[in-house]
Amino acid sequence: MVQDLPAQSWGSRLKDTLACLAGGFVCLGLASYLIFWNEKTGYRYDSSLEQTESLVIAVPDKPVNNDNNQSVVYLTGEALTNRSLSDLQLNITVSALALKRQVLVYEWLEEIDNDKAKPHYHYYTGWREKLIPSSSFLDPNSHPNPASLPIESLYQYAEDAALGDFVLPSTVIDAIPDAAKVDLSKVDLQSLQTKTGKQAALVGNEIYLGANPKAPQVGDLRIRVTAVFPQKISIIAQQNGNTLQAYQAPAGDSILLVASGEVSQHSLVDDARERSPAVVWFVRFICVLLCITGVSLLMRIMMVFADKIKLAHKVTRPGASLVSSIAGLSLWCLITAIALAPLQTMMPIILLAFAIAGVYLLTRLHFKV
């Protein structure tokens, strides 16, 4: 027997749509925040890069000229050290600018969901470098993490690391992109097992401390070791006495450019400039999706009135996806134009023109529906 279900009441449909309405405002609010943050951050970085580039002077790596103190300098040469760095736990010794032992622990993690009236706590396991104490959890007894680790991360830097007569601080060494994995095949796993009290195995070029790498348990560890070996590097930085540091540009960003090998100062700046748009455009794409999603969710409220209002029916029925896409993109153009208005001249005008064109297209689509 087929039974006709009663039509959903207008009030019920309105109630069901309020959640989408709230979600739409959240999406648009988040999109607006990200647009202003992204455009301001991207412009600030580009401006800082331009300011830094205009001040750069090329200097030799030795001797250090005190007349250039606090100046932005470009230099290239061999980054060297006469000392060795040792990891006593793993019995590793290398001649390097930096030696980094990274230890990841498999542990319980807590996630708080505040979207509901009452906070809801989720627990899951994952790999992290920092050990999270279970005492910070709402339910510490059911999700116990180790109280301590038998071996922890260790970052070491050569104190005599230098580029010619310039002393290289850890910030510069960390910026060197060419870090290599240290071969762990000669590590005494039996000795490490005795020290840590955990079964040790070599998996790839990582040391696994635990019973089964394929089925990790809470408290298991993974150890990776990398080193920055002596090499030729190129730097744009601020000279501070006989050392180098990031330059704080008037626009607001700190600029420190380091590349492996002999790279010209123009190439250093160009490489940094090319990386910036990729990040900016990625965030822009996310913001466009948020705007379209937000508009689409807000349009659902019109579906409630679609049977009551002829105009809403025309807008929401056949071309809802197309309308929300055009409206969302136009809204993104408008918000981005407002965000860029204090920073640029031409781009806000162009974006505003696109926004107006989108609105005009929407009116034409409306009359055609």
Annotate each predicted stretch with a short phrase:
Residues 1-12, 369:
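N-terminal Lys/Arg-rich, disordered targeting/topogenic segments
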Residues 6, 279, 283, 287, ...:
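Alpha-helical transmembrane segments forming the membrane-embedded cores
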Residues 10-13, 17, 254-292, 302, ...:
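Cytosolic-side membrane-insertion boundary helix
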Residues 12-40:
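Hydrophobic alpha-helical transmembrane signal-anchor segments
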Residues 37-62:
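Alpha-helical transmembrane signal-anchor/signal-peptide segments
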Residues 62-73, 91-94:
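Short, solvent-exposed beta-strand/turn "edge" segments of beta-rich domains on protein surfaces
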Residues 73-80, 310:
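OB-fold and OB-like beta-barrel modules that bind single-stranded nucleic acids
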Residues 78-247:
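Soluble non-transmembrane domains of integral membrane proteins
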